[in-house]
């Protein structure tokens, strides 16, 4: 299954969960899109697990194949499987570019990475799924700071997490791995573990 490129607002409304983490999608119409969107059928255990998996997958904008691969990688790490999975997702380069405030959305952050605008430890990395380690620095190429979309977001200098830092020269740093209570509080990762372990 390829990465979804359609309307994030429709997906958010279908899942009754803001995949952009802003909540804007649900303010106007907090029900699924379409003619029968306001009906909420009773959901099975499998349906709950699937929905939770989709909420997380769409939040990070990943294909099913990538998502599953990351889940399997997390099973080999020390710690609680579900939590390790979330930490791996949160450590992706495109996500940290978003958390640093270099982009308005994860999709925009992924585009910046894919087009070669992002440097890790001073070297160009154009793989959105690149897994960062604490202590690594993340910056934009000098020329890239003049891009209109970048200039717009940098005016606000909005850092979206305590486990990343940004100085006045726009040098970002992945300070440490996040604690579970610091991000995506609405996600129940245990349901996702149950979904894949069926």
Curated annotation (Swiss-Prot):
GO terms for cellular component: small ribosomal subunit. InterPro entries: Ribosomal_uS4, Ribosomal_uS4_bac-type, Ribosomal_uS4_CS, Ribosomal_uS4_N, S4_RNA-bd, S4_RNA-bd_sf. The keyword Ribonucleoprotein applies. It holds the Pfam family Ribosomal_S4. GO terms for molecular function: rRNA binding; structural constituent of ribosome. GO terms for biological process: ribosomal small subunit biogenesis; translation. Residues 91-151 form the S4 RNA-binding domain. This is Small ribosomal subunit protein uS4.
